[in-house]
Amino acid sequence: MFTKYVSNVALGSGTNYILDSRETRRYRVRAYFRPIMSGEFNWRIYYVNSVNSTFAGGTTAWRNRSGGKIRLLSAYLADGGEIDGREFIDGSLEPETLEGARRITFDSAESCEIAPDAELWSDDVRINIPDGHYLAFEWTLEGDAIPCTPDHRAAVFVDRGEGFAAGDSPNAPLPAMFGCERPYVKRLAFLGDSITQGCQTGRNRYEMWTARISAMLPEYAVWNLGLGYARAADAATDACWLKKAKQNDVVVVTLGVNDLLHGSLERGRSSMAGELIADITKIIVTLQSAGVEVILSLLPPFDFSEEQKLEWRAVNLAIPELARLYGCKIYNFMSSLEAGGILECKPKYGAHPNGDGGRVAADEFRRAFKTESGWRI
């Protein structure tokens, strides 16, 4: 399924949080996305009822936590209209129904149950999204523990029974992938944390480096697997999150900042450089064993303590050797995000790079991998 239906949206919509209400609640979610490739295609949505990575200290949501019993009541796709600079902040302006929406079914049924940890693929639905138009999505879910993310950066509205409301980062459950039967050269995933996901970039602006890179090479099917607070230790467990990464041809791994800040659940402390390198090595080996080409990123600068900066420097000095040992390419966008000298660890565009930082990081990707004959990935 993952070879036929590939990502066609560059924003991250994985799960690092959970709507844990201890009672069944209903959520109607509507979102607008800019598709990577426009046109008339067959689409399927893909969802996994579990939490991919650990959020903050892990008291509410932690990697591989099971979701609850979810009932999916309805789902739709539609042409969301012209991309016209709308701010998508006033839910009262949203129509009750999406004009021209196509109903999504699941094994020919309009609703379905999603068990804890279950994977769900919808049936296909054919829809035309003209160039310069949004892909609009809506679904209604009921459950007492629904995995989600607060940091998707999409134009999202949530109706909890009092009409659509929006915010900068509403807790909104969304499909893990908007799969599209479209032509592509390769499937390219970005496995990372909030910096990859694009936290602190403008909502609905597609300013993060992953979205900017996707715009540079629309013939590639880009899947943003970045999640706020995510650790390499989360991915190294080789569960629901890394399974997504294994469905790609190339994966750019940019993990480690939160390991140095927070550490893994098991350790209960900040990870040391050697521990982090061991977890990154597990990720490399697992991905390569699945036939995936791995590109390693140096860790970007962050607001670390002086002790953590020492570990950060040690990791960045070790990654090139790790890449040599395992035959990985290197993506060094760390230097372009530095305000000071090399390895000074002074963020130039904010600890979470803003839109300018996203542009600089994407430009570095182009310099590293674009040649006169094409992309070398």
Protein language model features and the residues they cover:
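Catalytic His-Asp segment of secreted/periplasmic serine-dependent ester chemistry enzymes
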Residues: 301-377
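N-terminal secretory targeting modules
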Residues: 1-191, 196-197, 201-203, 374-377
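Conserved SGNH/GDSL esterase-like catalytic core that processes O-acyl groups on lipids
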Residues: 185-190, 195-281, 303-306, 310-313, ...
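Structural motif
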Residues: 136, 250-254, 295
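Surface-exposed amphipathic alpha-helices with a cationic face
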Residues: 281-291, 320
